[in-house]
Amino acid sequence: MPKIAVLGAGINGIASALAIQERLPNCEVTIIAEKFSPNTTSDVAAGLIEPFLCDDDVDRIINWTSATISRIHEYQADGNPGAEEQSGYWLQSVKSEPKWLKLMKNVHILTDAEMKQVARRPEHKFGIFYTTWYLEPTPYIKWCTDKFLKNGGKFKKQKIENIDDVARSYDVTVNCTGLGSRALIGDKEVYPTRGQILKVSCPRVKHFFIDDKYYALLNDSTITLGGTFEAHQWDLTINSELSQKILKENIHNIPSLRTAQILSSHVDMRPSRGTVRLQAELGRSLVHNYGHGGSGITLHWGCALECAEIVENVLKMKKSKL
């Protein structure tokens, strides 16, 4: 029975492991990580489904996102929490209608009259209303984890310092360590983009609101207010002044947030990279799936399915050489 190690237990690690099990049920899959949910970078995310801070081929982005949307429908069909449609406004200083909008529902370019009603700043010159989804990572990761364990998967808590030491014990190793890949495999193309957010409660807010700098995104019982996009910043200290600014600026966009109850503040680092690295490494039984920027939730299932296919091909190549 082939043995597969998946390094990293965020949403891309657990999804890749589960996709491998489903595609290759004769394999033994082990997830190895130092941190597990709810203490991963994924758990901090609001789970808005749309590509964000991810510069990659648009067709790949659309295919991966489409697969994730189908996955959300499957998750919803089981009556699980933390996944629902959300509608709202994207206001822009420069007009943009990306191709991925075709995956969204109820897309409507705002008229001048509509813009006058929703614009809050001089830079709010163009706007789009649409319906997308949110997928709250923590309950979803638990759902995936339950499936993974039911399929015979294993977990191993370990700080990974040398990938070759791990790889010796497995037929294929899958690297889903995100920003950790910078130190683990020496990929200097992956870097942190610091993000600080607030979680608040405000039932009066019914629509998401995104502009060039700030956002308010809906979840089941909370709203995520952001945010910051600080490239190459490693500081995980919560800046209280910045939290106040995030709240103030979102209130400017959505006056109803004046009544919001602040629940918590969070900061983490998005694993940014010029493109997602989803490939087998030549000459090694090593597959990479990392560098999703701010789109880890959005792209996760499409990338996981492709990752599983790559793992299958690596195993076939190894078998053919025997």
Curated annotation (Swiss-Prot):
GO terms for molecular function: D-amino-acid oxidase activity; FAD binding; glycine oxidase activity. It is an enzyme of class 1 (oxidoreductase). Its cofactor is FAD. It catalyses: a D-alpha-amino acid + O2 + H2O = a 2-oxocarboxylate + H2O2 + NH4(+); D-alanine + O2 + H2O = pyruvate + H2O2 + NH4(+); D-methionine + O2 + H2O = 4-methylsulfanyl-2-oxobutanoate + H2O2 + NH4(+); D-asparagine + O2 + H2O = 2-oxosuccinamate + H2O2 + NH4(+). Transmembrane segments: none annotated. InterPro entries: D-amino_acid_oxidase_CS, DAO, FAD-dep_OxRdtase. Expressed exclusively in the intestine. D-proline binds at Y215, R270, G294. Keywords: Developmental protein, FAD, Flavoprotein, Glycoprotein, Oxidoreductase, Peroxisome, Signal. Inhibited by thiolactomycin. Pfam families: DAO. GO terms for cellular component: cytoplasm; peroxisomal matrix. It is found in: Peroxisome matrix. GO terms for biological process: D-amino acid catabolic process; digestion. Its EC number is 1.4.3.3. A motif (Microbody targeting signal) lies at residues 320-322. Disruption phenotype: Mutant worms (tm3673) exhibit decreased egg-laying capacity with smaller brood size and lower hatching rates at 25 degrees Celsius. Worms do not show any change in physical appearance. Glycans are attached at N39, N63, N175, N219. Residues 1-17 form the signal peptide. FAD binds at residues 9-11, 34-35, 40-42, 46-48, 159-160, 177, 270, 293-294, 296-298. D-serine binds at Y215, R270, G294. Catalyzes the oxidative deamination of D-amino acids with broad substrate specificity. Could be responsible for the degradation of diet-derived D-alanine in the intestine. May play a role in egg-laying events and early development. Homodimer. Belongs to the DAMOX/DASOX family. This is D-amino-acid oxidase.
